[in-house]
Amino acid sequence: GTIPCGESCVFIPCLTSALGCSCKSKVCYKN
């Protein structure tokens, strides 16, 4: 929840979810 993964999730889910990232406020974050 604190480290940006450099990916947005406005229209599509986080592809970086495979790396432990999740969507928060339209941006993918890790932890």
From Swiss-Prot:
This is a cyclic peptide. The presence of a 'disulfide through disulfide knot' structurally defines this protein as a knottin. Belongs to the cyclotide family. Bracelet subfamily. The keyword Disulfide bond applies. Probably participates in a plant defense mechanism. There is a cross-link at G1-N31 (Cyclopeptide (Gly-Asn)). Keywords: Disulfide bond, Knottin, Plant defense. InterPro entries: Cyclotide, Cyclotide_bracelet_CS, Cyclotide_sf. GO terms for biological process: defense response. The keyword Disulfide bond applies. Disulfide bonds join C5-C21, C9-C23, C14-C28. This is Cyclotide vibi-F.
